[in-house]
A protein has these predicted regions:
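Proteins enriched for Cys/Gly/acidic motifs involved in redox and nucleic-acid/cofactor modification
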Residues: 1-187
């Protein structure tokens, strides 16, 4: 299956996209440029500002317009915090900021069945850290390793606690294991 991915937002989104790309490649899928014809498109959205919300909507609409027969899947903070609005965009698969492995399973299923799926949990109830494979990004000399997710400060201007949930950390043994794996890859 050919899949195009577009990532908006922060280093966390970039890291999570890189982990999804690794898994998709391991599953035998071909990654293509977002503007190229594909069977499915993934938009990893952002919601830190109104501008990022707008860009998320624009990229979803662009994928739908450029390839009406493709499955359009969206994940990330915009989908997590604006579920009703995101559903109105005609997305085939909506999942927020959690459970990337299940997201990819659902994507493969959506391409086969053409059924619309919305699976967004309550971020504020999360208590475990989602362990994703560490790895380098294409054309980068530095690898990223996510060791923490979420926030509990609830600043009046910030949506992150609602998008990402409470603070959760990568267990120390898993962090050490991933650092060793990155070192073995030459980072």
């Amino acid at each position: 299956m050919k899949i195009g991915i577009y990532t908006l937002g922060c280093k966390v989104n970039q890291y999570e996209t890189q982990a999804m790309e690794q898994e998709l490649t391991a599953r035998g899928h071909e990654l293509v440029d977002f503007e190229s014809p594909a069977d499915a498109y993934i938009i990893n959205t952002c919601s830190v500002t109104a501008v990022s919300d707008k860009k998320s909507r624009q990229m979803i609409r662009r994928a739908k317009k450029n390839s009406p027969d493709a499955v359009v899947a969206a994940c990330g903070c915009y989908v997590q915090t604006h579920e009703k609005e995101a559903k109105s965009l005609g997305i085939d698969l909506l999942m927020g900021t959690n459970d990337r492995a299940r997201f990819l399973d659902r994507l493969e299923e959506a391409v086969k069945t053409r059924e619309t799926v919305a699976d967004i949990d309550d971020a504020l109830r999360r208590r475990t850290f989602e362990v994703l494979p560490a790895g380098g990004m294409a054309n980068r000399t530095r690898a990223m390793l996510k060791v923490e997710d979420g926030c509990v400060n609830f600043c009046t201007y910030c949506i992150i606690p609602y998008a990402r949930g409470p603070v959760r950390s990568l267990p120390m043994d898993k962090a050490a294991e991933q650092v060793r794996a990155l070192r073995a890859q030459g980072y």
